[in-house]
Amino acid sequence: MSGIRRSGRAVALVAVVLALAACSDQAGTAVSEPSTTTTASAADTPTTEATTSASLPYNETELQVTGSTGRVRYDVLIPQIEGGNPAVTGEFNESMRAALQDQIDGWGTDAFTLSSQEHSVAHIGEHVISGLLVTSWNADPPGAHPTPIVATVVVNADTATPITLGDLFPDLPAGLQALSDESARLLPATVAGPDFERSGIEPTEANFANWLATPAGMEIHFNDYQVGPHAVGLVTVTVPWDALADVIDPALAPVVSS
């Protein structure tokens, strides 16, 4: 059974990590390594007033998850946070672990491996936390080349709940159309070039499922092959929030842009 070690304070593991350990037929470890990055700031003086998410510090950490299901072998670092509002921290961490579990569960019936390619707590804002996980999928035995798989998590730090496209856009079709239009405007300036694959930006939830909330805008991460050939790598565009002003939920606009 896979073991799990955390540096710093102990953290209860969610069911997805327990499932990884339970089905593993190899020894493995999961290790969290706190970084030195601290965002936001705690109050300088004691107070008896209720503490808001904005006054609590969140520290970026990481967790190494290793093991095997028999069909899938994985050794992946996932982004995590510590500190702050425990409900927000728990929601973000569980969501990132669930994102990895989805990648382990959701790729056909053939044997494969998953390894780390990129992981980060991409943005910790006053009201929102965004996380990025990119793993490297490879056939087992290895095929022609690995394929990156993208996952993102966006959590409302005021309510400790994930923010979905349906939450962000009250009129979802209108929101998706705006994302499609803006992507068509922005993609020619990326490595995808003017001949980008247009089916990859059709106004569907699947095409815009991977996004991060940043102060600059809605950072959209396209999957491998989605808007161009494998050779160009993963492509991202950032749609400014003001370009989405007519379709975004007014109550969420200050949250995602914080």
Question: Language-model segments: what does each one mean?
Answer:
Residues 17-20:
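Bacterial Sec-type N-terminal signal peptides, specifically the leucine/valine-rich hydrophobic h-region
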Residues 2-11, 23-152, 156-258:
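Compositionally biased intrinsically disordered regions enriched in Thr/Gly
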